[in-house]
Amino acid sequence: MEFDTIAAISTALGEGAIAIVRVSGDDAVEKVNRIFKGKDLTEVPSHTIHYGHIVDLDTNQVIEEVMVSIMRAPRTFTRENIVEINCHGGLVSVNKVLQLILAQGVRLAEPGEFTKRAFLNGRIDLSQAEAVMDLIRAKTDRAMNVAINQMEGRLSKLIGRLRQDILETLAHVEVNIDYPEYDDVEEMTHNILIEKATHVRAEIAKILETSKQGKILREGIATAIIGRPNVGKSSLLNSLVQEKKAIVTDIAGTTRDVIEEYVNVRGVPLKLIDTAGIRETEDVVERIGVERSKEMMSQADLVLVVVNYSEALTNEDEELFRAVQGKDFIVIVNKTDLPQAIDMERVIELAAGNRVITTSLIEEQGIDELEKAIADLFFEGTIDSADVTYVSNARHIGLLTQAGKTIGDAIEAIENGVPIDMVQIDLTRTWEILGEITGDTVHESLIDQLFSQFCLGK
């Protein structure tokens, strides 16, 4: 496949030691060589780095001191010639280098276009391409490992094997229908077809079993910290984040807005939401914060309910317990360094079988137990991202669910005695749906939409 030559800044914009401008295309080396003062880049071997300067051809002025990496097709990310220019970080210098490259007839790359070319040129499939963005956005080591496994093709291989099984079954059916006189080909009976289709459905279900945990590792657990004012919600957030992100004071109602922070809890990414203290209030600003807190609580995957060990339960406390019924929640009884005034038996009763953990955040007690409880709740205490192929992408989960239903329709049709040639339709559709995961049967408009979500220069 032939494309024009593209370029973009591949590092984050801002001040830094190094910035990288990436160029990809058949004539990438020749275009960069025009503005490079140093070795003739068209003569150097592939996968080598060269020192020199970028020069403005109009003024013959040296613009930047650079190191240039030359990587020749097909052993590159895009399977095209790639040049990467390492220059000093900073908005002015790196943008000037980019502008000089574009002046040589190179086009500014669209978001995700380098990865899109890697896909279109057969370097990676669509699920591997999507994993590139997952790797960039990974919040924990576990999430990073899941993305790397997908980039290396672990999910692709599973899907490929399923599609091959279906294809072989379809071919067998075709031979039976078109060439019934062939005695050396086993007859595809309803029983054999049910066995093969059931195997495919079971494998799809097995992959989908990892989807809840996979989605958590990819997107995090939306976790709302709720409680009356001054029970220690912001202190809990700070203890988990291990930095002073929220303002902590002894004045009730200090947190008037919703504070969000990602935190790594034993490999699980938590999107922590510290909410304004929920209570009746006449303060307009505080009341807005309270309403937003209630909204965030309803959207959360996990709720941490904080109550005060040194105070008796109030009607507001009990109302919070009623509000979280039906959700995953953990109760934190904070301030155990103070004299007890709370009725712990009542707390356990209101928790309705959910974990109750006592803490003294000021003395840094109870956080380890809380982190373990969170990991136990969602992963039964273990996360084996190295050996398990997690499916974490919502698009993949949707397609696998759809494929499972379609193959289920095929099994039902076979059991009801529908002619085998009619069952082919559902089998073929299942094969096509699974192909959408890897990009083998996907529409071009979807490809464009997926890659438009990537960052520029990737």
UniProtKB/Swiss-Prot annotation:
Entry's Gene Ontology cellular component terms: cytosol
Keywords tagged on the record: Cytoplasm, GTP-binding, Hydrolase, Magnesium, Metal-binding, Nucleotide-binding, Potassium, tRNA processing
GO terms of biological process kind: tRNA methylation; tRNA wobble uridine modification
Residues annotated to bind K(+): N230, T249, I251, T254
Domain of life of the organism encoding this protein: Bacteria
Residues that hold Mg(2+) according to the record: S234, T255
EC annotation from Swiss-Prot or TrEMBL: 3.6.-.-
InterPro entries: G_TrmE, GTP-bd, GTP-bd_TrmE_N, GTPase_MnmE, MnmE_dom2, MnmE_helical, P-loop_NTPase, Small_GTP-bd
Chain ranges of the TrmE-type G domain: 220-379
The keyword Metal-binding belongs to this UniProt entry's keyword annotation: yes
Subcellular location: Cytoplasm
Binding-site list for GTP: 230-235, 249-255, 274-277
Record's cofactor remark: Binds 1 potassium ion per subunit.
UniProt KW Coiled coil keyword: no
One Pfam entry name: TrmE_N
Named cofactor requirement(s): K(+)
MF terms (GO), sorted A to Z: GTP binding; GTPase activity; metal ion binding
Record HAMAP family: GTPase_MnmE
Family affiliation: Belongs to the TRAFAC class TrmE-Era-EngA-EngB-Septin-like GTPase superfamily. TrmE GTPase family.
The protein's assembly and partners: Homodimer. Heterotetramer of two MnmE and two MnmG subunits.
Protein task: Exhibits a very high intrinsic GTPase hydrolysis rate. Involved in the addition of a carboxymethylaminomethyl (cmnm) group at the wobble position (U34) of certain tRNAs, forming tRNA-cmnm(5)s(2)U34.
PANTHER family: TRNA MODIFICATION GTPASE GTPBP3 (PTHR42714), TRNA MODIFICATION GTPASE GTPBP3, MITOCHONDRIAL (PTHR42714:SF2)
Stated name of the protein: tRNA modification GTPase MnmE
Biological source species: Bacillus cereus (strain ZK / E33L)
